[in-house]
């Protein structure tokens, strides 16, 4: 089931993304730049190792993980968090746990809805929704 996510996805719609970035502590200049991007998300799997690569004109990022195993993650804006990604009920659930007291925790959920990949990003009371289609 999770294999259906593999491929390249182009962002077509975004709601509340700048508000989400503000909630998790992303700086103003980075927020403004990132809010206007239309990145491509590439999801790959090799054995039990998953890759989530994001490409944009601003920055390219790579995240690799094994489902259910906690790992150290450096977010695109440079924050360090403890993360774990699980696959439950047809959804990838990515939990970012804060390390410093000043940081915020976040939950990123991805699922397929028709021909779209839907991503929600939640922190505190802020929820962002982003929609992607296959390239």
UniProtKB/Swiss-Prot annotation:
Q: Is this entry keyworded Nucleotide-binding? A: no
GO terms assigned for molecular function: fatty acid binding
Organism, by scientific name, is Caenorhabditis elegans
What UniProt keywords are attached to this protein's entry?
Answer: Lipid-binding, Transport
Q: Tell me which CDD domains the record gives.
A: FABP
Per the UniProt record, one Pfam family is: Lipocalin
Q: Read off the Gene3D superfamilies from this record.
A: 2.40.128.20
Q: Which residues bind a fatty acid?
A: 110, 130-132
- Which InterPro entries does UniProt cross-reference here? Calycin, Fatty_acid-bd, ILBP, Lipocln_cytosolic_FA-bd_dom
The protein's name is Fatty acid-binding protein homolog 6
**Sequence similarity:** Belongs to the calycin superfamily. Fatty-acid binding protein (FABP) family.
| BP GO terms, sorted | fatty acid transport
Q: Which cysteine pairs make disulfide bonds? A: none
**One cellular component (GO) term of this entry:** nucleus
